[in-house]
């Protein structure tokens, strides 16, 4: 794969398009409906302009925006299987593409806050992956922690897809979990503002390298009268190098050819730096099969629900009160 993007379908692998959707300013349900139609128009236009594209990705918050005064209100929440996601499904079916979409999802438990959700829809119009953000961007985001783990699904061109949402990508264990379950193309949809621009680029690359998988990442772009969102869609090779890098332009379409079989081959044939294997097979030259116990205290503590940092008792911010959120839990912000 080169770094010039493409418009045609490669002989092997597939073509992806990541849309640097302009950050939407949303004040009403009608604004959300307009966004849904804008996303659908963009999907069809992208397929027309890039006829070989098989996967089109939209960033976090592209459907409902980031109106923090209203984002928890019932008026602003959507449901997987509701009319908005059904409209996305119909668009994917008409365009014959896979699509990745973001919604803020009503929690089935009315006593708990909503989820920050991503879905993948196939060219038949079927929702084939439903992911709920595991690590909300605390203390800003009020979303309930996801309960579906890190699912993986089949995608185009021999790919195994997983999707993480924004801050999830800063947690290396999530990328490793996706890879451990077979993912070879790790998608990241984000609504980051410029505070973490450098770290965005760094972690997109490191998630690829540590797990011998492609990463495809896309962020909102533009200004919403509070923050600037940096765009900078990025496609990384399984060796951690950047193949395609977007700029800060709203509406920029970042395209690239991806060859999942190459990542699969690296996982099968590499000796040096096959670190996802080495983690569970330490020193396999000296000890046949390697040592399966990595001796990692934090993993054992996580598994036992005993994870605690040495400095945790002295941390200053461990709830959402700095942003005016209640500290009692339960459903708030209706």
UniProtKB/Swiss-Prot annotation:
PROSITE patterns: CN_HYDROLASE. Keywords: Hydrolase. It catalyses: formamide + H2O = formate + NH4(+). The keyword Endoplasmic reticulum does not apply. It comes from the Bacteria. GO terms for molecular function: formamidase activity; N-carbamoylputrescine amidase activity. Residues 14-260 form the CN hydrolase domain. The active site is at residues 60, 133, 166. GO terms for biological process: putrescine biosynthetic process from arginine. It is an enzyme of class 3 (hydrolase). Its EC number is 3.5.1.49. InterPro entries: Aliph_Amidase/BUP, C-N_Hydrolase, C-N_Hydrolase_sf, Formamidase. Is an aliphatic amidase with a restricted substrate specificity, as it only hydrolyzes formamide. Belongs to the carbon-nitrogen hydrolase superfamily. Aliphatic amidase family. This is Formamidase. It comes from Helicobacter acinonychis (strain Sheeba). The lineage of its organism: Bacteria, Pseudomonadati, Campylobacterota, Epsilonproteobacteria, Campylobacterales.
């Amino acid at each position: 794969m080169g770094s010039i993007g493409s418009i045609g379908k490669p002989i092997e692998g597939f073509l992806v398009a990541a849309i640097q959707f302009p950050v939407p300013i949303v004040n009403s349900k009608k604004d959300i409906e307009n966004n849904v139609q804008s996303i659908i128009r963009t999907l069809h236009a992208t397929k027309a302009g890039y006829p070989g594209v098989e996967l089109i990705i939209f960033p976090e918050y592209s459907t409902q925006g980031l109106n923090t005064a209203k984002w928890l209100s019932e008026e602003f929440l959507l449901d997987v299987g509701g009319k908005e996601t059904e409209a996305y499904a119909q668009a994917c079916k008409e365009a014959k593409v896979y699509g990745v979409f973001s919604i803020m999802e009503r929690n089935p438990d009315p006593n708990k806050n909503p989820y920050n959700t991503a879905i993948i829809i196939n060219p038949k119009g079927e929702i084939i992956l439903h992911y709920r953000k595991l690590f909300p961007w605390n203390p800003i985001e009020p979303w309930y922690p996801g309960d579906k783990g890190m699912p993986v699904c089949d995608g185009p061109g021999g790919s195994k897809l997983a999707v993480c949402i924004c801050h999830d990508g800063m947690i290396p264990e999530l990328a490793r979990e996706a890879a451990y379950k077979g993912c070879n193309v790790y998608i990241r949809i984000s609504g980051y503002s410029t505070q973490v621009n450098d770290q965005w680029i760094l972690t997109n690359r490191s998630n690829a390298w540590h797990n011998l998988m492609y990463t495809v990442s896309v962020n909102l772009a533009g200004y919403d009268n509070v923050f600037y969102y940096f765009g900078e869609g990025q496609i990384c090779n399984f060796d951690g190098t950047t193949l395609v890098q977007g700029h800060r332009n709203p509406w920029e379409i970042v395209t690239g050819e991806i060859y999942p079989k190459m990542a699969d081959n690296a996982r099968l044939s590499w000796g040096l730096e096959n670190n996802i294997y080495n983690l569970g097979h330490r020193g396999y030259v000296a000890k046949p099969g390697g040592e399966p116990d990595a001796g990692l205290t934090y993993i054992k503590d996580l598994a036992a629900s005993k994870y605690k940092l040495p400095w945790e008792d002295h941390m200053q911010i461990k709830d959402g009160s700095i942003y005016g959120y209640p500290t009692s839990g339960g459903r708030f912000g209706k």
